Amino acid sequence: MKVKVKTKAVAYLRTSSATNGDGDSQVRQRAAIAAFSKTAGFELVDEFADVAVSGADPIESREGFAHLLDRIEGNGVRIVIIEDASRLARQLVTQELAILALIARGVRVLTANGDDLTDDSDPSRVMMRQIAGCVYRKIKPARSDGEVRPRWRAN
């Protein structure tokens, strides 16, 4: 019988405030990442987090992201899993710099819903990722105030 070896991956979490670090945000992110990893056949071997870090903060100023890069360069893990693109960044430039830094190291960035943020084989995918990166920071504050809701949610 052949034993299937799981591909190793690391998780990256980001919370925008210290209270989110202790609260639901990290729990929710971990659960989504763990569920996706199990379903997709990845073995999570480490976790990196930036707590109380704005999604607009530059990648190079994030301690958790720096540790993630060190780990990648040191052990050959080539998959980073995040809950969604907003956990990486909420500014387009920050998002794209993070993705390019990981692509340069031969790393794929996957979201917990299976999107490959590093897949640049289809220009339309790249365009949609970049549009989402521009739009999310405008939508999120409005959604927090209850002004904008997805059509499928009544309240």
Show where each model-derived region lies.
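Short, structured surface patches at the beginning of a domain
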Residues: 1-150
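Charged, gly/pro-enriched flexible loop segments at helix/strand junctions
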Residues: 153-155
